[in-house]
Amino acid sequence: MPLCLTMDSHRGAMGPQQSRASRRSLFPYASHTLVMRPMTRPRILTKVFQSLLVIVLLVTIGINIMFIMDTSRRLQEESQHSVPGDNDDHVHAESRRNTLRLQESVPKSLAIDVLSSQMKVSVSVDGTTILEDGEDHKGRGIHVLVLNQASGSVMALRTFDTYSPHEDEAMALFLNMVSDGRIIVFAIKDEGTFQMKQPARDLLKRLGSKRAQVIGWRDMWAMVIHKGGKMFGESYSKSSEFNTWGAPVILRVEVPLVPFEDSECDWPYSEENRRRRDFCNHIEGYGSVCSCTDPAPLIFNPETILNNQVNDVPVAIIASNRPHYLYRMLRSLLSANGANPDMITVFIDGYFEEPLEVTKLFGLRGIQHTPIGAKNARISQHYKASLTATFNIFPNAKYAIIVEEDLDASPDFFSYFSQTKRLLEEDESIYCISAWNDQGYEHTSEDSSLLYRVETMPGLGWLLKRSLYKDELEAKWPTPEKMWDWDMWMRLPEVRRGRECIIPDVSRTYHFGASGLNMNSYFQDVYFKKHSFNTQPHVEMRNIDDVKKNNYEELIVGLIKKGTVLDHTKSPCDENFIPDRKGDVFIMYIKMDDPKDFVTWLQVAKCFKIWDLDPRGYHKSMWRMHMKGSEMLVIGVPNSEYSKYKPMSVAPISMEPIKGKVRR
């Protein structure tokens, strides 16, 4: 049926003829009635769809209006029946109901599965694997996993190679540092008892183990305990023969969880305790810092240093993924007189959470560095990135102190650098100032106020001049593909360019780290454990100017001239080679044909039980130390310029390596 549009005649003042003419002018091709053609099917569907949308919109608006009106009515009714304070009670009641619902949603127990075997160790909680180590030739020993007793979250994961010396002591220390109440899971991979001594076994027994005293060579073992409480389960498999391993053991236990409020300490609020709470609620193994009753302080108030020359010198701490080392190091550094936390930055090689959390625990600045390279090259690149970042963070700093995470700092660490820093300004022949003496052992050093000059770069806590790094070292630093040790590179003649480092007779740092890329417990025992370490808080370095270039030559010549030449017919390995007299100066001459001839020196170093892996700590082919209470100078002949003072009747001592024999 056609649609019709009827046009009305608007006559107004116009006559009939004008009206018709006007209509013709407006619609020259239309009659009084306009007939439209029928709409096509697509247009009809479009109109229908639009109409439906309008209807839906109207219905939605209506529903919302009804909801608003209903809500308003109920609010009015509640306000009519409420009294002051009722609303707070309602909110608190609702909060309690929500808390109860959350607690009901948390599991009341954990299903823990533990595997101990020759090739693999694993732990799963409620079907989720949280520890798995099946890598060849790695992960040997006892794996220890610490879980939160309220949530089941992982708080610590450590591996102790108890096949190696002293790892049982490290494990015992760690277990003693874990707070009571925590869930602890143990599992052996490969072998875990060869070096596990009785004290460690006794500790495991006190924790609940019934097998600790009998676990033997290549036996498999797993245990789950609640520290200070129940032992939930233990599984053991004995090795039948020396060349075989015990059968794999699988331990399955159900561990009940405790309420959250029973797993946290009620420390009073402070900024210090806020950091403590953040740390201790999800990380374990740090002992008294997380004690509920007597927590160790996190804020230190060391003495100030009179005329402190390093108060504004940035301190770069070179760290990796050894958080317990970092924790120990930071406590000693922040306790040292003159420490300024605002100038300390911890640089972490990799995106490891726990070292960063340790840094934040002490309120310090921490920067995670993206690893570049592998092994030695990675360490070298980490040092470079850290040094560059240090001088970028502190653009006005002329110096920087660099110290590693596995070092204790002496009480006068900053005082030592404050007193000696001016040497870098006044003597261009000085390369660095180090807190470490490579040859400073308990039996070879004794004067905390004495300084030496050495051609080697010791590291292990040292003061670097900005101009040296920016103008020379940074651009020439070994690239990532070069597997070089950064400190060995800095000792190269073409890099050092005849300059020397200043070191103390008694070191101001102590190397305690027994694990690392180039470190193990045996190496630590032999070469670092008996190093001397200053513990005096106030030491005034004497005759600082004596180590300036020209003054030092006069000093050494004076010592040689007044010294007593030892009996060169005796072996340096003989106990009576050095007389038991204190306060003297003893002189010893050894064979050294050229600057790289260290054959005899390394054998002498073995006899003296000091660093003997490579030549270190010498000045113009002369080594200086204390032995039996007297100063000792060892001079290489004919290479050293001091060899001219050798009496004609004295033949320099010559020693060759003894194959298969190590004198330590």
Predicted features and spans:
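C-terminal catalytic/acceptor-binding lobe
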Residues: 58, 265-297, 327, 479-664
